[in-house]
Amino acid sequence: MSRIQSTLAALAAKNKKGLIPFITAGDPAPELTVPLMHALVAGGADILELGVPFSDPMAEGPVIQRACERALASGVSMHDVLGFVSEFRKTNNSTPVVLMGYANPIERMGQTKFILAAKAAGVDGTIVVDYPPEECEEFAATLKENDMDPIFLLSPTSTEERIQQVAKFGSGFSYYVSLKGVTGAANIDTKEVAERIAAIRKYVKLPIGVGFGIRDAATAKAVAQVSDAVVIGSRIIQELENSPREQAVERVQTFIAGIRKALDE
């Protein structure tokens, strides 16, 4: 059982919901990434999603696009991202870390080389936005052989066939994108999310995390009632954008602690 699987199983056994915050590696500054990772855990995160900066992040809204631009301007590469995970692992060997990004940086490195380097760094899974499950069977299999989980996206427009492909090739959890659009968009319809997740669960036996559009404790709590975990990204990046550099880590920890409290009530 992978670290992601055991974490989510332990939460389910306690009737608790997973909290999965997202930050972009290297934003707002490379030296803050590892302190932010630890602060998110201290605030109650169960799994961390670390975004790999990319110049054309097509699924992201303007907030995460800006985060990618800032990280790239600091020269953050895939090598650096794996270095952040290695540094984090020196003092935390229990919280799963998922890398989220796009195929290009992985292809540049080479799939096998990336997987071995990610395993050595202490990565637990990947979400590659432009790797549909039916096109990356070998990548998914190699990840699993190395005790990492290939995590795939599902959306309101996913076909039955796509859902079955995710059930076949995915592991760890499935990531349901709650909105038609980009990250950070507004107004989640929790009734619609509940209906879609019920349809997905006919095929997918993995835990389901929901992201895109979760901006506050009330929305997180509502979404958690129909899912296994909530993913929050753009709202955290906004907190970083609006915080003086010296207060950024503390403010993010306070924000995520508020979400944790709401999920546990």
From Swiss-Prot:
Keyword Amino-acid biosynthesis: yes
Active site per UniProt: 49, 60
Database matches in InterPro entries: Aldolase_TIM, RibuloseP-bd_barrel, Trp_synthase_alpha_AS, Trp_synthase_suA
GO molecular function, one term: tryptophan synthase activity
Catalysed reactions, semicolon-separated: (1S,2R)-1-C-(indol-3-yl)glycerol 3-phosphate + L-serine = D-glyceraldehyde 3-phosphate + L-tryptophan + H2O
Record's keyword terms, sorted: Amino-acid biosynthesis, Aromatic amino acid biosynthesis, Lyase, Tryptophan biosynthesis
A matching Pfam family: Trp_syntA
Pathway of action: Amino-acid biosynthesis; L-tryptophan biosynthesis; L-tryptophan from chorismate: step 5/5
Record-listed E.C. numbers: 4.2.1.20
NCBIfam families the UniProt entry points to: trpA
Family note: Belongs to the TrpA family.
Job description of the protein: The alpha subunit is responsible for the aldol cleavage of indoleglycerol phosphate to indole and glyceraldehyde 3-phosphate.
Subunit structure: Tetramer of two alpha and two beta chains.
Name this protein carries in UniProt: Tryptophan synthase alpha chain
